Swiss-Prot record:
Source lineage: Bacteria, Pseudomonadati, Pseudomonadota, Betaproteobacteria, Rhodocyclales
Gene that produces this protein: rpmB
Record SUPFAM superfamilies: L28p-like
One annotated GO molecular function: structural constituent of ribosome
Gene3D superfamilies found in the cross-reference section: Ribosomal protein L28/L24
Protein name per Swiss-Prot or TrEMBL: Large ribosomal subunit protein bL28
Annotated source species: Azoarcus sp. (strain BH72)
Amino acid sequence: MARVCQVTGKAPMVGNHVSHANNKTKRRFLPNLQNRRFWSEAENRWIRLRVSNAALRTIDKKGIDVVVAELRARGDKI
């Protein structure tokens, strides 16, 4: 799946457009994904990730090395 955050797993959701007349049509809510690269002190290299804005906040809080270790523990290739 293309529009999925590599850290949080956030993916598109399905909902409704609701007009002023209360007509409903299907729409997709897309996650706010950003292609970012992070400097890893432990590996002494740049790590590229496609992450949501919520994941950026998580990386700021925990640190990129901790987040990458968690990704590798669950089997993702980084």
